[in-house]
Amino acid sequence: MIIKPRIRGFICTTTHPVGCEANVKEQIAYTKAQGPIKNAPKRVLVVGASSGYGLSSRIAAAFGGGASTIGVFFEKEGTEKKPGTAGFYNAAAFEKLAREEGLYAKSLNGDAFSNEAKQKTIDLIKEDLGQVDMVVYSLASPVRKMPETGELIRSALKPIGETYTSTAVDTNKDVIIEASVEPATEEEIKDTVTVMGGEDWELWINALSDAGVLAEGCKTVAYSYIGTELTWPIYWDGALGKAKMDLDRAAKALNEKLGATGGSANVAVLKSVVTQASSAIPVMPLYIAMVFKKMREEGVHEGCMEQIYRMFSQRLYKEDGSAAEVDDMNRLRLDDWELREDIQQHCRELWPQITTENLKELTDYVEYKEEFLKLFGFGVEGVDYEADVNPAVETDFIQI
């Protein structure tokens, strides 16, 4: 079939398998061009490995460090009549390309929050790798099914205390609007922490540790975003921020646990990027369009792959073997360039000036839209979108 983009709200309901593969190839090419990561781990588990920072982590480990990788994710495969999710095609492409280079790559597809996912992953590690040297936790899900009760808990992207009103962009109509978001209830805050906090990360590490599949010196990292006062009301000071603070709590507990055998646990604070997750957060698309333009002008813009390569090579696995620089909460900070005072001051001054008329001129909004479509495999250079493609892609993913 010939597949065209169809947008509904914050998601594109169609995906292009060839475009998704081209995206993965692009990230691999970048990683190889940077050269090998000297002290990289050799056996890596990535939970949430099919898109965004998780996918880039798997690419950095495999193509930057020569690692054997296991990926866990929850994606829908395509049929001959209907495309699957972008993450499905990303993961399929990664496996194919890794194996072509003689790298071990296996994936498990299903609910990473479940006990079954943890058990099947442990079984696979025991069978194929023995142990792992690194665990990346990169889940971004709006819903968590509680393993013991089957209850579905949902997160809320809302402020705390009072209604938040701000200039935002309606990405469907490309117009500037006033967006208002009602505050979260106590219940919604609690639920957001349950879904997006550190509990499941702890459950994963504890299960892996109890099963004896964490190697001595194993490092684990989970991803977070803090941002600046421009986004704090909806993000860091909102329900989502409470969940991210819980991630810090979990990191502290896990760091003590893994530290006993020479390992470590850190939260890595990353910069804002165009992802399905960030596009759903009010205000983020406009902020991203502004900050990207300034960062590009300053020569410090990074996408997922650049960020993660820098995290591996300049933080966690430095060439000289020295310890990573961390902030006062023991976090790895990769948002350092985005938070530069000149860049933030530019955004603060620009924010009130943005109108529908000057949006495309004063910000990288056009590029934002292009990057958003790229997430789903559209608008990728060198892909023939008039060509007939088969959305049913063969994989040997292990079903959870």
From Swiss-Prot:
Residues flagged as site, Plays an important role in discriminating NADH against NADPH: E75
Associated pathway: Lipid metabolism; fatty acid biosynthesis
Listed GO MF terms: enoyl-[acyl-carrier-protein] reductase (NADH) activity; NAD binding; trans-2-enoyl-CoA reductase (NADH) activity
Disulphide-bridged cysteine pairs: none
Keyword tags: Fatty acid biosynthesis, Fatty acid metabolism, Lipid biosynthesis, Lipid metabolism, NAD, Oxidoreductase
GO biological process per UniProt: fatty acid biosynthetic process
Keyword flag S-adenosyl-L-methionine: no
Positions that bind substrate: Y225
UniProt-listed Enzyme Commission number(s): 1.3.1.9
EC class name: oxidoreductase
Active site: Y235
Any Pfam family hit: Eno-Rase_NADH_b
Coiled-coil ranges from the UniProt annotation: none
Binding-site positions, NAD(+): 48-53, 74-75, 111-112, 139-140, 244, 273-275
Catalysis performed (reactions): a 2,3-saturated acyl-[ACP] + NAD(+) = a (2E)-enoyl-[ACP] + NADH + H(+)
The protein's assembly and partners: Monomer.
HAMAP family in the cross-refs: FabV_reductase
Described purpose of this protein according to its UniProt entry: Involved in the final reduction of the elongation cycle of fatty acid synthesis (FAS II). Catalyzes the reduction of a carbon-carbon double bond in an enoyl moiety that is covalently linked to an acyl carrier protein (ACP).
Protein name (Swiss-Prot/TrEMBL): Enoyl-[acyl-carrier-protein] reductase [NADH] 1
The organism's taxonomic lineage, starting at the top: Bacteria, Pseudomonadati, Pseudomonadota, Gammaproteobacteria, Vibrionales
